[in-house]
Amino acid sequence: MRGKFIVVEGLEGAGKSSVIGLIVKALTDAGMRVEQTREPGGTPMAEAIRECVKHDWDETVSEETELLLMYAARVQLLTNKIYPSLNAGAWVVGDRHDLSSQAYQGGGRGVSEKTMTAISDIALNGFKPDLTLYLDVDPAVGLERARGRGELDRIEQAGLGFFERTRARYLSLAENDESIIVVNAMQPMEQVHQDVISIIANYVSQHIDEGSESHKTDQGNN
C-alpha cells in the first residue's frame, strides 16, 4: 500500500520544526514507517542547492534564478527520496514542498502565475502532498522569533512586506484546496501542538480504516 505525504508549511518563526517532530512521533507510535525530508534539501545534491539558495551572494539573484534552483532541488528530492519512500509504503513528513514556492516566489517575489504554473507542471507533473498543515503566524511575530534564533539568511532578510505578501498567498491557496489545513500558530505552542495531534490522529484513523476496507475488498475478490 502506498504511503502518504504530509507537509508542514509556514513563514519563518511559525514553529515548523517542533510540529514536524510531533508528527513524526505520532506516526511512528501509530506503527507507520516514517521518512522525514526538508526543502530545499534532503539529498546531497539538493542540500548543495539549499546552501546556494540561502547564501548572501555579492551579486543580484533574480526571482527566476531563485525559483529554478528551488525546483531543481525539489525534483532531486522527489526522484531520490520521496517517490521511492511512498512507493515502498512509508509515510513521508516534509518540511516545506511546492506550496512554499507558490507562496514565497509567486506571492512574495511576484513571479507571474503563468511562469509558476509552467515550471510546476514540468517539475511535478501533477504530484502534490496528501495533506498539508499551514502554520499561520503574523509575519512581524514570525520574523522576531527568527531573529531570536540568530543571524538571518538571504531569504529571511527580504523584509516585512515580502512576508506579508507570502502569507497572503498561502492563505489564498489554502482557501481553494481542501488538502491544506490552516493551523493558528499565534496560539501558545502547547495549543498548537494539541491542534496538530488532533488533525494527525483523525487523518491516520481515516486512512487506516480505508486501508482495512481495501484489504477486505481484495480478500473478497480472491
Swiss-Prot record:
Asked if Nucleotide-binding is a keyword of the record, the answer is: yes
S-S bonds: none
Q: Name one GO biological process term.
A: dUDP biosynthetic process
Q: Name one GO molecular function term.
A: ATP binding
Keywords, in A-Z order: ATP-binding, Kinase, Nucleotide biosynthesis, Nucleotide-binding, Transferase
The free-text function statement in the UniProt record for this protein reads: Phosphorylation of dTMP to form dTDP in both de novo and salvage pathways of dTTP synthesis.
What family name appears in the similarity comment?
Belongs to the thymidylate kinase family.
Task: Name the chain's protein.
Answer: Thymidylate kinase
The scientific name of the source species is Alteromonas mediterranea (strain DSM 17117 / CIP 110805 / LMG 28347 / Deep ecotype)
